[in-house]
Amino acid sequence: MGDPRKSKKKWMGPSHPWIKINLGKEQILIGKYGLRNKKEIWIAQTMIRNFRHQARSLLALPPAERNIREKQLIQKLYRMGILEKDNSTLDDILSLTEENYLERRLQTIVYKKGLARTIYQARQLITHGHIAISGRKVTSPGYVVLRGEEDLIDYYPTSPFKQNPPSQGEVNVEQA
């Protein structure tokens, strides 16, 4: 487990946070995915940066070892749902963006499944304990949903939303 006093942070912020182009992109992502702050974007960027770094380092390995590790990395990203196809290549990993990671957050998937009317309501339902994955309550909107868990997302069994879900109306999935 490790010593709790020696924990590392999961993200690395920008070296210069006030670049105008990046500010605009970050604001769009915050609105599109209902994020609370830019740290959540930086976590996604760091995760994708690490995956891309692993892919680049694989290119330097001998072909025999490279093929084994390449398959392992592709399988991991496929199980996480970040890669769409099981037979992806390193080029697909190198072309990943932070949006690929943000699409796999529990908050986004709850909204896209229609369990919440808005992306912000999805965040609130999760933090208030109304959402479960295979019957287990998950209260972190940033939880990365694995491909196998996606169909198991539902309301928590004792949640009042289980019997009376929020009225759906028109949910525009393309806009969010």
Curated annotation (Swiss-Prot):
Record GO terms (molecular function): rRNA binding; structural constituent of ribosome
Q: What's a GO cellular component annotated to this UniProt protein? A: small ribosomal subunit
**What functional role does this protein have?**
One of the primary rRNA binding proteins, it binds directly to 16S rRNA where it nucleates assembly of the body of the 30S subunit.
Protein family (similarity comment): Belongs to the universal ribosomal protein uS4 family.
**What name goes with this protein?**
Small ribosomal subunit protein uS4
* PROSITE patterns assigned to the protein according to its UniProt record, in alphabetical order: RIBOSOMAL_S4 (PS00632), S4 (PS50889)
SMART domains from the UniProt entry: Ribosomal_S4 (SM01390), S4 (SM00363)
Q: Subunit structure of this entry?
A: Part of the 30S ribosomal subunit. Contacts protein S5. The interaction surface between S4 and S5 is involved in control of translational fidelity.
InterPro entries to which the protein is assigned, alphabetical: Ribosomal_uS4, Ribosomal_uS4_arc, Ribosomal_uS4_CS, Ribosomal_uS4_euk/arc, Ribosomal_uS4_N, S4_RNA-bd, S4_RNA-bd_sf
Boundaries of every S4 RNA-binding domain copy: 104-166
Q: Which GO terms describe its biological process?
A: ribosomal small subunit biogenesis; translation
Q: Which UniProt keywords apply?
A: Ribonucleoprotein, Ribosomal protein, RNA-binding, rRNA-binding
